[in-house]
Amino acid sequence: AYLSGDAATLIETYLADAGISFDELSDGARLADLQERIIEPLRQYLLQAECSGAFVLLNATAGKNAAEPTRSGLYLQVNGYEADRREIILYRGIPSVGKAHGIMPHRKWRLEAQRNVIRGWDDSHSRSHSYSDPARMPAHTYRFTEIFTLPGMSEKAMLLMLPIRGSDGKALGVCGFEVSESCFARLHSQTTKLSHFTGLLTYDDDSHMDGDSIISFFSCGADDGYYRAPGGVLAVSDFGDGILKLTGDDNTYLGMKRSYNDARTGGSFATFVMTNKSDYDSAAMDTIVKNLLLIALLTALSIAFCVFFSRSYLAPVLKSLEQLKRDEQRAHRG
């Protein structure tokens, strides 16, 4: 919400200083001036947040004759997630503005963002459409997009989107943050004793889960050691005793699922905690072997105890009884 409010203030301040309306922004020089004001605050938001990208995209474009609708603005990404080395790059925006601040264009850079691939653009506006006063917009006006692949990128991402609305309620654009699958894997790695722990996050809906298959998801592993992300579609089946079997292109997992709803955004999510089936089978075999050894040991101890008891206690008693019996027989004969 802070990013949305600050972006609206920066936009309206620039419009007032330039003496123009928002509808007159569709000019390269004016858009460059506005991006110059936005880029440093946006970079600070990105550096402070645990995410892989941050953006401010406007309901304005310099390419009105483009074949596909685009929107001007800034979209910054983090190149590397180490705390002491976080390079910021320009994914969308005017390159001269970025270079002036030491931010170089991404190798898949484009000037503007295609509106049809920024998932949730229209929905972000519709959620806040009835609030003419932005200060009265509730927190649930933000939303998470589906997990998808950004144009030109190789990995999947999810966006948290908020509408930008002026003091008069006018829709100025959208802003928010990006979480890529590699960023998710780093932030949510777990401390565990499992050799090959794997965690999944996905939407519990038809666009991400096709019947008994998981189509699109984020994954994470243990915070130490090697981690290999599951590949392809994961087919889900019942393994018994509340355990699920998940079969991928190159591995099979066993795990458990938990579903939950986000009341503020209306999203339904599902998390899976899994381990390799081969690890489970190995652990199960180890348990069987240990149980057999324990049974054999207990049996041997029982036999040894019986032998010891018979020799130490039972044999003398029987010998005494036998002696008494012989004594009685001699007494009767005498």
Give the residues covered by each predicted segment.
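Extracytoplasmic/periplasmic sensory segments of membrane signal-transduction proteins
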Residues: 1-132
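Extracytoplasmic/periplasmic ligand-binding sensor regions of membrane-associated signaling proteins
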Residues: 94-176
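Conserved beta-strands of PAS-like sensory domains
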Residues: 152-190, 268-279
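A short, hydrophobic, proline-anchored segment that marks a local hinge/packing element in signaling
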Residues: 158-168, 254-265, 316
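Short, hydrophobic beta-strand elements of compact beta-sandwich sensory domains
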Residues: 173-181, 246-287
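Intrinsic low-complexity, intrinsically disordered coil/linker regions enriched in small/polar
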Residues: 182-266
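Cytoplasm-proximal transmembrane signaling helix
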Residues: 202, 270-328
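HAMP-domain connector/hinge
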Residues: 329-334
